[in-house]
C-alpha cells in the first residue's frame, strides 16, 4: 500500500511540475494500444502456419488437385471460410447453430425498448450507464486551462478528469488532495476528453458505515393504476454526493419498478433525520451544479418515491 501511495504521489508531483495533463493522457492511452499490438502478431503467426502446409501440398500438383477439388465443391458456398476453419470442418455447422440460438434471444431484449416511451429514452440511457467508484485516491488540481477547472484522479495510472462545478469550484484549491472518493459516470463533453465526469467528489470514510434507509414507492401507470412497493437503499459512506444518490436510486427504480418505461415523471424525496429534505425530479436529469452537493449519508432517515 505504501508503494502504491508513493507511486501515485510521484505521479501527482510530475503532473504538477509539467502542468500538462494532455501529454499524460496520451501516454496513458498509448500504453493500452501497445498491449493489443503485442497480442496481434501472436495471433497472426499461427494463421500463417496453417496456410503454409496448404501451400506445400500445392507444390505437388497432381495429388493436390485431386484432394482440393472435392473440398471446393463441398464448400463452394463459403470458399474463404474453408481456408480458415479447415481443421474443425466438422464443427462448422455448430457456430451456425450458435448464431441462430442468439437470434431468438435478441427479440426478448428488443421487447423492452418497445415498451419505452420515446420521450424517456435519453433518461433511461443515461441512468443505465455503468458507474465507477474510486476510494482513498489522490486528486490533483492544476491551473485552469479552460472555462472550468478539473480534479485529476489517477487510479491504475489512467487519468479521470472530474469537473469542479457548484460548491466544488470553491471547495477545492490547486494542489494535491488526499483521501478522496469519487463517483464517476462518464459523460459527453466539449473538451475531447474520454474519461470525463462531473461532481461526485467526497471525503473518504473515517470509519465503517453500514446504513440502510427505507424506500416507499408509489407508482401510477399510464392507465391510472396505482401500486405500492417497499424496498431499502444501502449506504456505506459517511459522505455521499447527490450525484451518487440520485444515480443509484434511479437505476434501482429502473431495474425493479420499470422507471422510464411508460412512465417517467414524479419525484424522489430524501428525508433527513434532522428534518431536512432533498428532491430529485424524475422528468429531467440532475442539474450539474447539484452533482457536487454532499450530504451526511448516515443522517438519511427514509426515501419517498412517487412515479407517474
Curated annotation (Swiss-Prot):
Region (Disordered): 28-117
Domain of life of the organism encoding this protein: Bacteria
One Pfam family hit: Stap_Strp_tox_C
Keyword list, A-Z: Secreted, Signal, Virulence
GO cellular component, one term: extracellular region
UniProt cross-references to PROSITE patterns, sorted A to Z: STAPH_STREP_TOXIN_2
TM spans (from-to): none
Compositional bias (Polar residues): 33-47, 55-76, 94-114
Function recorded in the entry: Secreted protein that plays a role in immune innate response inhibition by interfering with host TLR2-mediated pathway.
Domain notes: The C-terminal domain contains a V-shape binding site for sialyl Lewis X.
NCBIfam families xrefs: PRK13042.1 (NF009600)
Family as reported in the entry's similarity comment: Belongs to the staphylococcal/streptococcal toxin family.
Name the UniProt record assigns to this protein: Staphylococcal superantigen-like 4
Lineage start: Bacteria, Bacillati, Bacillota, Bacilli, Bacillales
Amino acid at each position: 500500500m505504501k508503494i502504491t501511495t508513493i507511486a501515485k504521489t510521484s505521479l501527482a508531483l510530475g503532473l504538477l511540475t509539467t502542468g500538462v495533463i494532455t501529454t499524460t493522457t496520451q501516454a496513458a492511452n498509448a500504453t493500452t494500444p501497445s498491449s493489443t499490438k503485442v497480442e496481434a502478431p501472436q495471433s497472426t503467426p499461427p494463421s500463417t502456419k496453417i496456410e503454409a502446409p496448404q501451400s506445400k501440398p500445392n507444390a505437388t500438383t497432381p495429388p493436390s488437385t485431386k484432394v482440393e477439388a472435392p473440398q471446393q465443391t463441398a464448400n463452394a458456398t463459403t470458399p474463404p471460410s474453408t481456408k480458415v476453419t479447415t481443421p474443425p470442418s466438422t464443427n462448422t455447422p455448430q457456430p451456425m447453430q450458435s448464431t441462430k440460438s442468439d437470434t431468438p434471444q435478441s427479440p426478448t431484449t428488443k421487447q423492452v425498448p418497445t415498451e419505452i416511451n420515446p420521450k424517456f429514452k435519453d433518461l433511461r440511457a443515461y441512468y443505465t450507464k455503468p458507474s465507477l467508484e474510486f476510494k482513498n485516491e489522490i486528486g490533483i488540481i492544476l491551473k485552469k486551462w479552460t472555462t472550468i477547472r478539473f480534479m485529476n484522479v489517477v487510479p491504475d495510472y489512467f487519468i479521470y478528469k472530474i469537473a469542479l462545478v457548484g460548491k466544488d469550484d470553491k471547495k477545492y484549491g490547486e494542489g494535491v488532495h488526499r483521501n478522496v472518493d469519487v463517483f464517476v459516470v462518464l459523460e459527453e463533453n466539449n473538451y475531447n476528453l474520454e474519461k470525463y465526469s462531473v461532481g461526485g467528489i467526497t471525503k473518504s470514510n473515517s470509519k465503517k458505515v453500514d446504513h440502510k434507509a427505507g424506500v416507499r414507492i408509489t407508482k401510477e401507470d399510464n392507465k391510472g393504476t396505482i401500486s405500492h412497493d417497499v424496498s431499502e437503499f444501502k449506504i456505506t459512506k459517511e459522505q455521499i454526493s447527490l450525484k451518487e444518490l440520485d444515480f443509484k436510486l434511479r437505476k434501482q427504480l429502473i431495474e425493479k419498478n420499470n422507471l422510464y418505461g411508460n412512465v417517467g415523471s414524479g419525484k424522489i424525496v430524501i428525508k433527513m433525520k434532522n428534518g431536512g429534505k432533498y428532491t430529485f425530479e424524475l422528468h429531467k436529469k440532475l442539474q450539474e451544479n447539484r452533482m457536487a452537493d454532499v450530504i451526511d449519508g448516515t443522517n438519511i432517515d427514509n426515501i419517498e418515491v412517487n412515479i407517474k
